[in-house]
């Protein structure tokens, strides 16, 4: 079951400290009033089958059950050609996105800003092998229908957002939302991870969430993001 949460982005990077206000005014006048973000957790991965030892396996793929779960998303949230599909740079998320979009020729992009994220954040935590990011060369070879977002922080293509500080993560969220707006699509569909999706929800909704709020495999969470109140803030 999906959830819809309406938010108004008045805290976007650069606005609150006076940078980029002119850009946003022009941006707002040229673009639509908002967009819908549809977060989907990937299907069941091999790393969950024999935990904790299976968490040490790098780049785990979907299980057969995970593939079947991904097929069901085609019915639960049918994609349209005008949608933009964004996937975390892991095998299981890219496989989920590939299956979901098998019947639709929509634009598909890989982006490290929705890669695995530890939740709740723990200072000093380390990234497990199952959450390592797939390198760009392998993505191009295995998932050639996906384009790679190249304008992002190069360090995040190797280390990801898994253990970055909360302040750094919040800046990532703000940058990601502006980037999504620049795409010009009404619906942005994002295949990501339980911790990442919950971290995005917590920051955008300004509420305290726990691991009990994690989506189930191929669970869906929708947000309608509006720019309406932004003009009054700048």
Predicted regions and their residues:
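Short, Lys/Arg-enriched N-terminal segments with co-localized hydrophobic residues
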Residues: 21-34
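Phosphate-handling substructures
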Residues: 47, 56-61, 104-171
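Domain-level recognition of soluble alpha/beta enzyme cores
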Residues: 205-231
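Conserved histidine-centered catalytic loops in small-molecule metabolism enzymes
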Residues: 80-113, 140-151, 224-234
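Generic beta-sheet signal
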Residues: 37, 83, 186-194
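Active-site-proximal alpha-helix that buttresses catalytic centers in soluble enzyme cores
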Residues: 36, 40-109
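Glycine-rich phosphate-binding loop signature in dinucleotide/nucleotide-binding domains
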Residues: 79-81, 182-185
């Amino acid at each position: 079951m999906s959830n819809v949460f309406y938010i108004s982005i008045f805290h976007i990077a650069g606005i609150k400290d006076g940078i980029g206000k002119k850009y946003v005014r022009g941006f707002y006048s040229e673009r639509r009033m908002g967009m819908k973000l549809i977060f989907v957790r990937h299907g069941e991965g091999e790393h969950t089958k024999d935990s904790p030892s299976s968490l040490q396996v790098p780049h785990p793929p979907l299980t057969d059950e995970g593939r079947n779960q991904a097929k069901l998303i085609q019915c639960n949230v049918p994609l349209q050609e005008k949608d933009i599909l964004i996937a975390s740079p892991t095998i299981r998320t890219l496989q989920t996105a590939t299956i979901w979009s098998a019947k639709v020729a929509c634009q598909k992009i890989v982006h490290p800003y929705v890669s695995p994220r530890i939740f709740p954040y723990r200072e000093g935590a380390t990234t497990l092998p199952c959450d390592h990011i797939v390198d760009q060369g392998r993505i191009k070879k295995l998932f050639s229908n996906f384009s790679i977002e190249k304008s992002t922080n190069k360090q995040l293509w190797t280390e990801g957002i898994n253990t970055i500080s909360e302040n750094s993560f919040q800046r990532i969220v703000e940058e990601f939302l502006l980037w999504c707006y620049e795409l010009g699509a009404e619906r942005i569909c994002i295949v990501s991870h339980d911790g990442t999706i919950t971290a995005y929800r917590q920051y955008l909704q300004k509420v305290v969430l726990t691991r009990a709020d994690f989506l189930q495999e191929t669970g869906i969470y929708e947000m309608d993001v509006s720019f309406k109140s932004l003009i009054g803030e700048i």
